[in-house]
Design a protein with these regions (language model features):
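Bacterial signal peptide processing site
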Residues: 24-26
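Short pre-active-site segment immediately N-terminal to the catalytic Zn-binding motif
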Residues: 404-425, 439
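A well-structured
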Residues: 76-351, 520, 587
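Post-HExxH zinc-binding segment in Zn-dependent metallohydrolases
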Residues: 325, 329-330, 437, 442-484, ...
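C-terminal, non-catalytic "cap/extension" segments appended to globular domains
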Residues: 206, 424, 464-465, 489, ...
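C-terminal motif of bacterial Sec signal peptides marking the signal peptidase cleavage site
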Residues: 18-22
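Auxiliary, metal-adjacent structural segments of Zn-dependent hydrolase domains
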Residues: 342-408, 417-418
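Catalytic glutamate of the conserved HExxH
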Residues: 423, 427, 431, 435
Length: 621
């Protein structure tokens, strides 16, 4: 029985790691503050973790007779009239052409701006030249995003994998070029006029001295080394081959699709034993390069660089550390108590085919107002989403933006069960934000507020399209996921803090594994006797490799989402109203947006106690 309990715990934990690390809006790629309508780079590749099948209990209980699925009440729909206005004519995603972008156009456009500034040309001459720079920038990142999406749609497609790796390395050069353009404008006699008419408040002061440039030649070289290491990581996890105890070599993901119970567990041990040392070395090399980036940019360490430059957070690493300690105090004990009941592991997520999923999603968004419904139908009309299951797809879900077309794209790794509803809702929250706001500048913490809040709002709108049993399961599953998210993402955040606080020369695969194992113990998601395996599970967290210091965003931003949910529970419609008001935001930052909406800061005294009390009432009564 103990081994079966371990198996259930491991499978659920690994699945949770896969689900929670696969929900990013966009990556922390090297970028500069974008001029109006600038595009984004694509989202990262989260952990490659398959969907497990647990061995059945030796004393199975009879399955209850399924309740009939209610027929949804049809709701009127008005054809969307949105005109996106991108520089390229919008076509369905699968008809969008791909062509490797050249930087010649961007270089020529930047040179033309410099010549016009030197010649003292008026703003009316310079504005279209700056627009040409933005167009070239958008074209590059649109192709970057398309290559990423298509490499995720078929991870065996070597063409798009190579294209994405090439453009990922080149992105540092693009950022350096754009930064030089901004300094050229900020150091010109027209700096103030350009700030007022074209750029953003504070632009002239920010770019008045190019000795403060972030993208030095040294930094670009380090970023390219980082990109090459990311490519090495992606190659390792794309299609791993494991050697079994009898010497047989098998494709890991293919074998997992067919394995069950103890065979599944044996494959896990084989994979982690063989790939942890390789991936750990890649990770250590990444940490060394990133610490060098921090020195190059004048930061004390990479954690400070990530908080200040990469994520532009409106809270400090010190505040984050205090928040993690509060999670240990108020959330971890509740997590341990709830998980000991076994209720979370016994939830049956059932099955959900693609057509029924589409019916459920369409019904849910139809009850969120015309704007949300229009956005969904526009997405479907132009096939700006991929919700289909395929064994060739990357095991992740994300949303990214196609700047040249002025539209987002939603990618989801479908599991074929009720969990697809919340996975879609999360990414559609990102999609809705990107669509409504044309991907206007915002911090990732704010972006996660919109995605996590929509997950919870969707739960409140499915009573006519799910059976009572399905809705109860989905509700409990989501609440358990939230509790796990607070605990596990906090552990991951502390893991990164410890690793990046260690002298890089003292890092080894054994040390990294030991740090992660100790945090598994401290945060309550480990099993005595299987320490060797638990210490190696961290290699499934793609954010460690591709988006360092992202994970703290999940628990911090979820506090805002929980406040929206509580409003909806107390007064139906109030939470949605608050959400839509926040969506049309006046601020790019999480705290300013939340406080302006009348919500509390996640860092206010007592906030985590309130979250724990709410979760206890829902999960333990």
């Amino acid at each position: 029985m103990r081994t079966q309990k371990l198996l259930a715990l491991l499978l659920a934990l690994i699945l949770c790691l896969s689900m929670m690390t696969g929900c990013a809006k966009k990556p922390v790629a090297p970028t500069v503050p974008a001029a109006p309508a600038a595009g984004d780079s694509p989202a990262p590749a989260p952990a490659s973790t398959p969907k497990p099948t647990a061995e059945p209990s030796p004393e199975p209980t009879p399955e209850p007779t399924p309740e009939p699925t209610p027929e949804p009440t049809p709701k009127p729909y008005v054809e969307p009239t949105s005109e996106r206005g991108g520089m390229w004519d919008l076509v369905p995603f699968d008809e969008m052409p791909y062509e490797r972008p050249s930087l010649d156009g961007l270089d020529a456009a930047i040179e033309a701006v410099g010549e016009a500034l030197d010649a003292g040309e008026p703003y009316e001459v310079i504005e279209p030249l700056l627009d040409a720079c933005d167009d070239a920038y958008n074209a590059f990142y649109t192709m970057y995003s398309i290559s990423f999406i298509r490499s995720c749609q078929d991870k065996t497609d070597e063409f798009y994998a190579d294209e994405y790796a090439y453009l990922d390395e080149l992105s540092a050069d693009v950022s350096q070029r754009m930064e030089k353009l901004y300094f050229r404008c900020g150091m010109s006699d027209m700096a103030q006029e350009l700030e007022e008419k074209y750029f953003w408040p504070g632009f002239a002061e920010e770019y008045a001295d190019d000795s403060n440039a972030f993208y030095s030649d040294e930094m670009v070289e380090l970023l390219q080394k980082d990109a090459n290491l990311v490519a090495d990581y992606r190659e390792l996890v794309a299609n791993p081959i494991v050697t079994l105890s009898d010497g047989t070599e098998v494709e890991y993901f293919t074998a997992l699709e067919e394995a069950e119970g103890f065979s599944y567990l044996s494959l896990l041990f084989a994979y982690y034993n063989q790939y942890n040392p390789q991936l750990a070395q890649v990770y250590i090399d990444m940490v060394k390069v990133r610490q060098q980036q921090a020195v190059s940019a004048g930061y004390a360490n990479y954690e400070e660089l990530a908080f200040d430059h990469s994520f532009e957070r409106d809270y400090s690493p010190e505040q984050a550390a205090e928040y993690l300690q509060a999670i240990k105090t108020y959330i971890v004990p509740l997590y341990k108590e709830y998980m000991d009941t076994g209720a979370y592991w016994s939830l049956d997520q059932g099955s959900l085919d693609a057509q029924r999923l589409e019916d459920i999603l369409r019904y849910g968004v139809s009850d969120m107002g015309q704007e949300v419904q229009d956005t969904y139908e526009f997405m479907v009309k132009y096939r700006l989403c991929d919700l289909e299951y395929s064994p060739k797809k990357s095991e992740m879900s994300f949303q990214t933006y196609l700047g040249a077309y002025e539209v987002p794209f939603l990618f989801m790794d479908s599991s074929g069960n009720l969990g697809d509803i919340t996975t879609f809702s999360h990414e559609f929250g990102h999609y809705l934000d990107g669509f409504v706001n044309y991907d206007a500048d915002e911090t990732l913490d704010l972006a996660e507020c919109f995605s996590q809040a929509l997950e919870l709002l969707m739960l409140t709108r499915l009573d006519e399209v799910l059976s009572p049993q399905e809705l109860d399961t989905l509700y409990k599953m989501k609440m358990g996921d939230i509790l796990s998210m607070y605990v596990q993402q906090a552990a991951f955040a502390e893991f990164e803090h410890i690793i990046y606080s260690t002298d890089p020369e003292d890092l080894s695969p054994e040390y990294v594994n030991q740090v992660f194992l100790q945090l598994c113990v401290d945060y309550g998601f480990s099993e005595a006797g299987f320490e060797d395996l638990y210490g190696k599970l961290w290699i499934d967290i793609s954010h460690f490799f591709e988006q360092p210091f992202y994970v703290i965003t999940y628990p911090v931003s979820h506090d805002i989402a929980m406040q929206v949910f509580q409003l909806e529970e107390e007064n139906p419609g109030a939470g949605l109203e608050k959400y839509l008001a926040m969506l049309h935001r006046d601020y790019p930052d999480m705290l300013d947006t939340a406080l302006n909406a009348g919500l509390e800061s996640p860092f206010d005294p007592g906030r985590l106690e309130k979250v724990a009390a709410t979760m206890r009432e829902i999960l333990l009564g």
